[in-house]
């Protein structure tokens, strides 16, 4: 079960960092494709 917890923490941390960078810099690609 520990591996599951560590994996969840890793994915959540990467997700937070990705969203932080994505919202910090203006997306150069039109986001109309993403609904």
Curated annotation (Swiss-Prot):
Entry's localization field: Plastid, Chloroplast thylakoid membrane
InterPro entries associated with the record: PSII_PsbT, PSII_PsbT_sf
Phosphoprotein as UniProt keyword: no
Lineage: Eukaryota, Viridiplantae, Streptophyta, Embryophyta, Tracheophyta
Function: Found at the monomer-monomer interface of the photosystem II (PS II) dimer, plays a role in assembly and dimerization of PSII. PSII is a light-driven water plastoquinone oxidoreductase, using light energy to abstract electrons from H(2)O, generating a proton gradient subsequently used for ATP formation.
Record text on subunit structure and interactions: PSII is composed of 1 copy each of membrane proteins PsbA, PsbB, PsbC, PsbD, PsbE, PsbF, PsbH, PsbI, PsbJ, PsbK, PsbL, PsbM, PsbT, PsbY, PsbZ, Psb30/Ycf12, at least 3 peripheral proteins of the oxygen-evolving complex and a large number of cofactors. It forms dimeric complexes.
Protein family per UniProt: Belongs to the PsbT family.
GO cellular component, one term: chloroplast thylakoid membrane
UniProt KW keywords: Chloroplast, Membrane, Photosynthesis, Photosystem II, Plastid, Thylakoid, Transmembrane, Transmembrane helix
Naturally occurring in which organism (per UniProt): Magnolia tripetala
Annotated TM spans: 3-23
Name used for this protein in its record: Photosystem II reaction center protein T
UniProt topology in membrane: Single-pass membrane protein
Gene Ontology annotations of biological process type: photosynthesis
């Amino acid at each position: 079960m520990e591996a599951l917890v560590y994996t969840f923490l890793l994915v959540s941390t990467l997700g937070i960092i990705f969203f932080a960078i994505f919202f910090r810099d203006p997306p150069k690609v039109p986001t109309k494709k993403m609904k």
